[in-house]
Amino acid sequence: MPEGPEIRRAADNLEAAIKGKPLTDVWFAFPQLKTYQSQLIGQHVTHVGTRGKALLTHFSNDLTLYSHNQLYGVWRVVDTGEEPQTTRVLRVKLQTADKTILLYSASDIEMLRPEQLTTHPFLQRVGPDVLDPNLTPEVVKERLLSPRFRNRQFAGLLLDQAFLAGLGNYLRVEILWQVGLTGNHKAKDLNAAQLDALAHALLEIPRFSYATRGQVDENKHHGALFRFKVFHRDGELCERCGGIIEKTTLSSRPFYWCPGCQH
């Protein structure tokens, strides 16, 4: 599943294609959304936001399209009039004079009014977004030490969107390697230096993944163009200590780590 940086890049691409342009055609596959088609003709997208792995397309009439790609959903940008050759099932079409954005295969799609943005079950449940520039290491540290999260092993905590939105498996692996911790550690057991390092890494690594999308590198995952230190590198040498990177399973997901320097 794409993680926060990849969802944010998808949002950037959608914004670049149609933001501010009047919608000339709107189509939704799901019957409960059909009524909104005519309401959106002539309106425009004001911005495309993200909350973790959810994408929020905001319109000029104050409606917001909520979509979560889950495992299979994917957005495409095409020239208006172009029909992509695909076996995927079309769910959403937002068309302007020159560009059209298409959502395929996703099933978690809703239209929200302003007051629903604070009451929607997923949006209520997720924690602060790691790509939110207003989120600071100090706030992350407070969350790590809160009664809700301080006793949880990082193996599961760093996959829990209620803790921080936008994290996923490759980020979990890379963050824990960066700070020399394992998936079995808990925030309550860390010293001040470890806690500080983790709080910074939880923000810096996702933001670095997002920001370095233009760099060329062979180690790619869902378009994250930054160099993996351990993810998908089992059997290779750890660049920090020279140990052998291992692969195991933690919280039902593949986990990569170096026993030589993560302990």
From Swiss-Prot:
Q: Which cofactor does it need?
A: Zn(2+)
Origin superkingdom: Bacteria
The disulfide bonds in this chain are: none
Q: What's the protein called, per UniProt?
A: Endonuclease 8
Molecular function per GO: class I DNA-(apurinic or apyrimidinic site) endonuclease activity; damaged DNA binding; oxidized pyrimidine nucleobase lesion DNA N-glycosylase activity; zinc ion binding
EC id = 3.2.2.-, 4.2.99.18
Q: What is the lineage of its organism?
A: Bacteria, Pseudomonadati, Pseudomonadota, Gammaproteobacteria, Enterobacterales
Which family would the database say this protein is a member of?
Belongs to the FPG family.
Q: Which residues form the active site?
A: P2 (schiff-base intermediate with dna), E3 (proton donor), K53 (proton donor), R253 (proton donor)
What biological process terms from GO does the record include?
A: base-excision repair
Gene3D superfamilies in the record: 1.10.8.50, MutM-like, N-terminal
Which keywords describe this protein according to UniProt?
A: DNA damage, DNA repair, DNA-binding, Glycosidase, Hydrolase, Lyase, Metal-binding, Multifunctional enzyme, Zinc, Zinc-finger
Q: Which PROSITE patterns match?
A: FPG_CAT (PS51068), ZF_FPG_1 (PS01242), ZF_FPG_2 (PS51066)
